[in-house]
Amino acid sequence: AQDYHIKSWATVLTRLTSFRASVSILGGSPVTKETDLLSPDKIVENIDGIVLAGGSAFGLDASSGVMDCLRDQNRGFDTGAIKVPIVPSAILFDLKNGGFKEWSINPYRELGQNAFLKVSHDFEIGSVGAGCGATTSIVKGGLGTSSLFYGDRIKVGAIVAVNSVGSPCFPGTNFLFSDLYGEKN
């Protein structure tokens, strides 16, 4: 889900049942929630969703919106008293992208809920969802995915939201480093 007025977004990954996940956190100032639970030595083996969002620390509220939706479905880690939806989140900085940021109520909880309600097997990549407000120096950042299948039972997928520092171009040119490695689109 994206909000073009604030130029920010949220992307949600979930399944009908809990699933295993891992994470790689990069960058000089990561904003995350519950990503430590993805280490193999933790008691929680499965999660209920993943959130990628903009908004710097404000964006952490997107996972609260997703947790609300999952709780409505009676999903989560069973503590014996209540089920707690496990929703690791990674957030990008997009507060300087020109969008409206003078809101009085944090919009990210609603963005998270909207993204959860729009979950489907097919989704867009690029400057949508987690890529809506992302930038990479002088060009747009975005959302990308990859997946592998091993037989009928094992499926491995990766999703990344790119909002990096530095230039994606050869110094003094408009030629992208990636031009050396892929097709031109």
Tell me the role of every PLM-derived stretch.
Residues 1-185:
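Alpha/propeptide regions of enzymes that mature by internal proteolysis
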